[in-house]
Regions:
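An interfacial alpha-helical scaffold signature
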Residues: 1-240
Length: 240
């Protein structure tokens, strides 16, 4: 039986034409150091893909075989939201900002407009914790668990690269390895990843670069606060 409460609740997206919201378009065009934060701030309505199940087939009499029907709304489906592999093979809930990006990703998928708050809550319940926005496009962005929690609860997101505690850890690492590395900084990448930018002198031995990069990665991995806040990170050693 249909959920009468949901049927009687006005649909806030009844007139949604599937185009990209203007505020999100502006966020996509932001400078790289502010882009991800502006995206999180701008997100409101997203499109969730609903991928149709294969036809169950028919019997000898042409009758459709028994099968379990699924709700039409993605938030009500038992199998959960559609996911894709992203950073380091991890799974992220797939969302889109506009219908064209969704159909280019999967021509059979049906777009359903949903609030980012409801999507974020469902993502956390699904124990995925990550959202990938507009996968397969130039705007593809992965939102880590801290961003998803903020979108679910409301409030302002503190990006890991802007977190004073994490920056303090990076500063200590730069001091600890100052004899081997010229600088260590935490920078945002345009795709949502936090980059640990490590600059070495050009005459640094490969063994030294690898050893220091591994030591820095181990420190970040074993620090409980950093590990909880810095869930999308990439170590990038490079010459000066």
């Amino acid at each position: 039986m249909p959920d009468l409460a949901s049927l009687l609740t006005p649909n806030p997206y009844a007139n949604d034409d599937g185009s990209m919201p203007q505020e999100l378009r502006k966020a996509y065009e932001s400078s790289s150091d502010q882009r991800v934060e502006n995206i999180v701030r701008a997100l409101d309505r997203v499109l969730l893909p609903v991928i149709p199940h294969a036809h169950p087939g028919t019997d000898a009499n042409g009758k459709v075989l028994e099968h379990t029907s699924q709700p039409s709304h993605p938030l009500e489906r038992e199998e959960g939201l559609v996911t894709a592999q992203v950073h380091n093979g991890r799974s992220a809930v797939v969302v889109f900002s506009h219908a064209e990006a969704l159909t280019n990703w999967n021509a059979t998928a049906r777009p359903v407009p949903v609030s980012i708050e409801a999507t974020a809550i469902a993502t956390l319940k699904q124990k995925t914790g990550l959202i990938v926005l507009d996968p397969g496009t130039d705007n593809e962005t992965v939102l880590g668990r801290t961003a998803v929690i903020t979108l679910a609860a409301g409030g302002k997101w503190l990006a890991p690269w802007a977190d004073p505690k994490i920056r303090g850890v990076i500063t200590k690492l730069a001091e600890e390895y100052r004899d081997h590395v010229l600088s260590i900084e935490l920078l945002p990448d345009v795709n949502g990843t936090a980059i640990v930018d490590m600059v070495f002198s050009r005459d640094s031995a490969t063994e030294t670069v690898v050893a220091v990069a591994q030591a820095v990665a181990a420190t970040l991995e074993t620090d409980p606060y950093v590990r909880a806040r810095l869930d999308l990170v990439e170590i990038r050693p490079r010459p000066e």
